[in-house]
């Protein structure tokens, strides 16, 4: 063999070795296209989805086991001072105003007797927010702290609490709803910033034992929904198949939603608006009957309430599509077992048994996502990932642990949009159909 050929052969071998470590886009694209040929007819995938939906409709609600049932009964006794955890419930306006009146009268009597006044507020400190395996959600331990109008350090917080109680009382008496922003702007100088009024609003919910929606104070619209769903919004009939690419805004007043109907086989929960728009424009819900919703990032209260209500009333499985990074998993965990800042209302805000469809860390190699479409994890990403591994609700799911360990080992993350490197419609035409066909969720 000539020296030239030997050099050429060595060079080719080196190039081949390099390619095996980092697939060229053309190689990855070729493999991605080969996956398309593995797709079975839609009728076969639909049969799989019907079986999943049927099994979900027959299964007992999460937390209905004997141990969870007894725990739920104990928690439901919201007026029982011996109850270990706080549970709030929806209440009508008359009940909430009556409770506010009793608080104010007690404060007035205390002042007239010369003792001053103090609010007994459930402590929402981090140490009181715990994950309860039997209920599969984060709950708030029942511990109270005093908020007296006694000195400079406590008087301002007590004043803000009294002001919020007064504003909520006025809103309920008028029978209207206001946003958290509206509430803040009623007394900007007192509140200082909206974080103050928002935090006290949560305190008031705990004090009164009611959900925040019972206070008639809501967040601005954020989440959207599209797909095989119809419902009445304050009497107006909404057809979510006719909402266009942007979808229908999820109403902030979930109590005004009624008449929910659907022929969907599953609910697809999407982390980001970009993926939602792709799914909506391609009318993915017509090919595979589903309801698609997103909170466009961090889950807001209205979207969490709406998702839970759809799950409970329609008895459909929920599949989640999030970024392959620690924050995608954190967002998924908020939907499933709640957030710590609203742990007092986790019974109403959580949707257990959401199945993690993608994009999972193991998918990056399985679907040969090109290296240039992956991102290196930052030190902060790694820190968040390690913290997640220590969370009890993560330890309960072996699949989550394995995926997180894969992410931390490879130190790589990727957004849902990384799949667009194979084509803008690869998500809807290949990736998701193949995932559904293979029942590839955890």
Swiss-Prot record:
Protein's UniProt name: DNA topoisomerase 6 subunit A3
Tissue expr: Highly expressed in flowers before pollination. Expressed in roots and shoots.
GO BP terms in the entry: DNA topological change; meiotic DNA double-strand break formation; meiotic DNA double-strand break processing; reciprocal meiotic recombination
Gene Ontology molecular functions: ATP binding; DNA binding; DNA topoisomerase type II (double strand cut, ATP-hydrolyzing) activity; magnesium ion binding
Record-listed E.C. numbers: 5.6.2.2
Pfam family, one: TOP6A-Spo11_Toprim
CDD domains the record matches: TOPRIM_TopoIIB_SPO
Alphabetized HAMAP family for the sequence: Top6A
Self-association state and partner proteins as the record states: Homodimer. Heterotetramer of two TOP6A and two TOP6B subunits. Interacts with TOP6B.
Enzymatic reactions: ATP-dependent breakage, passage and rejoining of double-stranded DNA
Organism placement in taxonomy: Eukaryota, Viridiplantae, Streptophyta, Embryophyta, Tracheophyta
Localization per record: Nucleus
Induction context: By auxin, abscisic acid (ABA) and benzylaminopurine.
Positions of the catalytic residues: 185
DNA repair recorded as keyword: no
Positions of Mg(2+) binding: 271, 323
């Amino acid at each position: 063999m000539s020296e030239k050929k030997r050099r050429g052969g060595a060079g080719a071998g080196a190039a081949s070795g390099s390619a095996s470590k980092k697939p060229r886009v053309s190689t990855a694209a070729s493999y991605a296209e080969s996956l398309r040929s593995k797709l079975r007819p839609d009728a076969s995938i639909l049969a799989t989805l019907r079986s999943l939906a049927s099994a979900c409709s027959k299964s007992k609600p999460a937390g209905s086991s004997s141990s969870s049932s007894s725990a739920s009964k104990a928690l439901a006794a919201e007026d029982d001072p011996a109850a270990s955890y706080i549970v709030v419930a929806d209440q009508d306006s008359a009940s909430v105003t009556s409770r506010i009146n009793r608080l104010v009268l007690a404060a007035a009597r205390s002042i007239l007797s010369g003792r001053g006044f103090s609010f007994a507020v459930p402590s929402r400190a981090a140490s009181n927010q715990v994950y309860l395996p039997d209920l599969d959600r984060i709950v708030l331990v029942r511990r109270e702290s005093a908020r007296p109008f006694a000195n400079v350090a406590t008087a301002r917080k007590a004043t803000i609490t009294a002001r919020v109680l007064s504003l909520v009382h006025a809103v309920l008496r008028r029978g209207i709803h206001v946003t958290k922003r509206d509430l803040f702007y009623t007394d900007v100088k007192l509140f200082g910033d909206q974080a103050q009024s928002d935090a006290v609003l949560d305190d008031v919910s705990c004090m009164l034992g009611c959900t925040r929606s019972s206070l008639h104070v809501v967040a601005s619209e954020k989440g959207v929904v599209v797909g095989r769903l119809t419902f009445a919004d304050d009497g107006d009939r909404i057809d979510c198949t006719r909402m266009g690419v942007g979808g229908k805004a999820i109403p902030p007043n979930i109590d005004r939603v009624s008449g929910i109907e659907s022929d969907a086989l599953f609910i697809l929960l999407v982390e980001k608006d970009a993926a939602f728009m792709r799914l909506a424009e391609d009318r993915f819900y017509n090919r595979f009957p589903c309801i698609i919703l997103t909170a466009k990032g961090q889950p807001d209260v209205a979207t969490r309430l709406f998702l839970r209500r759809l799950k409970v009333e329609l008895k459909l499985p929920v599949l989640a599509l999030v970024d392959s990074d620690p924050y995608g998993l954190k967002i998924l965990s908020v939907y499933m077992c709640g957030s710590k800042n609203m742990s007092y209302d986790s019974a109403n805000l959580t949707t257990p048994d959401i199945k993690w469809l993608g994009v999972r860390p193991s998918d990056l190699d399985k679907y040969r996502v090109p290296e240039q479409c992956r991102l290196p994890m930052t030190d902060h990403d790694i820190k968040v990932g390690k913290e997640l591994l220590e969370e009890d609700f993560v330890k309960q799911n072996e699949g989550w642990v394995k995926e997180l360990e894969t992410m931390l080992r490879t130190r790589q993350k990727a957004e849902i949009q990384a799949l667009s490197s194979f084509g803008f419609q690869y998500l809807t035409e290949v990736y998701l159909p193949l995932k559904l066909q293979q029942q590839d969720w955890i």
